[in-house]
């Protein structure tokens, strides 16, 4: 059973304590009403994993846990099998005592692009919206964050996060809650808020930007990473039924348009930190994610286009500040 009591106790003593007015009731309702048909199977996989305390833990350069002496073949097989019960693994990679989870996305590459542009994370309280398996939460801790909180309603991601946490010595510096941003009150409590790979899934992107702003302290930093297209500040793509085979893609602005949106929502010091084309080396099918991936979503005769004829995915990182 995945519990959230440790998180409640943690925030009861800090500047997030006002979240306890709504959060426990929301989590209780989620536990009663909204569990996925496979959730019991996934949570059992987490429960059956051994509790491990790393002899060496690297969260600065990767998410790697090692034991002082190599695990036995039986121990490795047990961990490997239980982690494979949580497939597909999309965000990573993780290296856990000799079990290497080669995820669909090289999320470490994204982190390497983002990190140089951030304010120092040392001592910061961070929110990661749409955090997936929580890979970047661990990297935030590795970069010095005091507390990293992720929210993502996808229940498989919660189980993946808890599995990794159990193998990292039950580390309580990072937490994942099965919520969407719309379920959060205006906490105004986070020093840095990340939204990576979320904006294009929102029917109202400006509302999403306001929701992110409501989570930041004054002078707090927003890190926004999303799909963009080429163009000026008035260029926005509104795809038809699908974009790169994804149904729920609503608005893909140019980076200059996105900068303008952020300024319209009252952010200051907005800058475009990075723009890059997503490659089939960064997002691909692996033995830990065996279904279709980016290569299947691009026009086989013209890799600069999706199968629907739109510009192929490129992603921008924008940094902004709440006044």
Curated annotation (Swiss-Prot):
Keywords: Transferase, tRNA processing. GO terms for molecular function: methyltransferase activity; transferase activity, transferring alkyl or aryl (other than methyl) groups. Pfam families: Methyltransf_9. One of its GO terms (biological process) is tRNA wobble uridine modification. Its EC number is 2.5.1.-. It catalyses: carboxy-S-adenosyl-L-methionine + 5-hydroxyuridine(34) in tRNA = 5-carboxymethoxyuridine(34) in tRNA + S-adenosyl-L-homocysteine + H(+). Transmembrane segments: none annotated. InterPro entries: CmoB, Mo5U34_MeTrfas-like, SAM-dependent_MTases_sf. Carboxy-S-adenosyl-L-methionine binds at residues 91, 105, 110, 130, 152-154, 181-182, 196, 200, 315. Belongs to the class I-like SAM-binding methyltransferase superfamily. CmoB family. NCBIfam families: PRK15068.1, tRNA 5-methoxyuridine(34)/uridine 5-oxyacetic acid(34) synthase CmoB. Homotetramer. HAMAP family: tRNA_carboxymethyltr_CmoB (MF_01590). Catalyzes carboxymethyl transfer from carboxy-S-adenosyl-L-methionine (Cx-SAM) to 5-hydroxyuridine (ho5U) to form 5-carboxymethoxyuridine (cmo5U) at position 34 in tRNAs. This is tRNA U34 carboxymethyltransferase. The gene is cmoB.
